[in-house]
Regions:
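Catalytic-core segment of enzymes that process non-peptidic bonds
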Residues: 11
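Active-site-adjacent betaalpha module
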Residues: 2-6, 15-16, 21-144
Length: 144
């Protein structure tokens, strides 16, 4: 926020029928149902975001809308001149999905993951996701 960076937040957004989806069957934990308390951003996170931050609602692990938004910056500034830094939850589900989607669409765009600003479902799956991202040329910082 203080550096004037563009801030884009993805936000899990599910419907009441979440448990009937493939994700809901395999991850039977109702979460982020639109317009519920659990769907809202944490107050501290909201306070840290600038007023002009973009919030992308995503019903899946990775966001195709995020790809389009990043694509606008890539078109304007060039792939190597756009740098993405990723933080968030869950490292082993949504974070790794978004990182790899962006890397697939923009292989020359530098992507950094700040591991201290992420958390996985378990410490082991968090570490596995970090290892996966490193193997796919995502720059991982603060992992130790």
């Amino acid at each position: 926020k203080e550096r004037g960076d563009v801030i884009i937040a993805t936000k899990d957004t599910h419907e009441e029928s979440y448990l009937e989806t493939q994700e809901g069957v395999n991850l039977p934990f109702i979460h982020c149902v639109q317009n519920t308390e659990g769907w809202q951003l944490d107050d501290a996170v909201q306070a840290a975001m600038p007023e002009n931050a973009t919030i992308v609602h995503k019903p899946t692990f990775g966001s195709t809308d995020l790809v389009k938004i990043i694509g606008e910056y890539v078109a304007q500034y060039g792939e190597t001149n756009v740098h993405m830094e990723i933080v968030g939850l869950c490292t082993d589900i949504c974070v790794v999905s978004n990182a790899l989607i962006e890397k697939a669409f923009y292989p020359e765009m530098p992507i950094t993951l700040d591991a201290k600003c992420c958390a996985g479902v378990t410490p082991a799956t968090h570490d596995a996701a970090i290892a996966t991202m490193r193997m796919c040329q995502i720059n991982v910082i603060n992992a130790d």
